[in-house]
């Protein structure tokens, strides 16, 4: 699902909200989450999951075009850990044949 598809779904289910209002709310939420992660903060949404940063150590990689070894610096990458309710719901749907 893309961001625009999510906006459409919310607008369809919530008749009182305009497409522009939903778009602004989602943009604001994503921007705030990005800013929190950029400063090293952890985001926890109970029942859904948590977002945090994991450190990837420096390593030697390979350029796929040339096959030559390339030194890659260490970096932080966003990580999502699903909450129990989300895991249970996904597995519940899987058991029903979805």
Swiss-Prot record:
GO MF annotations in UniProt: DNA binding; structural constituent of chromatin
Presence of keyword DNA-binding: yes
One Gene Ontology term from the biological process aspect of the record: regulation of DNA-templated transcription
Coiled coil: none
GO annotation, cellular component aspect: chromosome; cytosol
Keywords per UniProt: DNA recombination, DNA-binding, Transcription, Transcription regulation, Translation regulation
Family: Belongs to the bacterial histone-like protein family.
HAMAP family assigned: IHF_beta
UniProt name for this protein: Integration host factor subunit beta
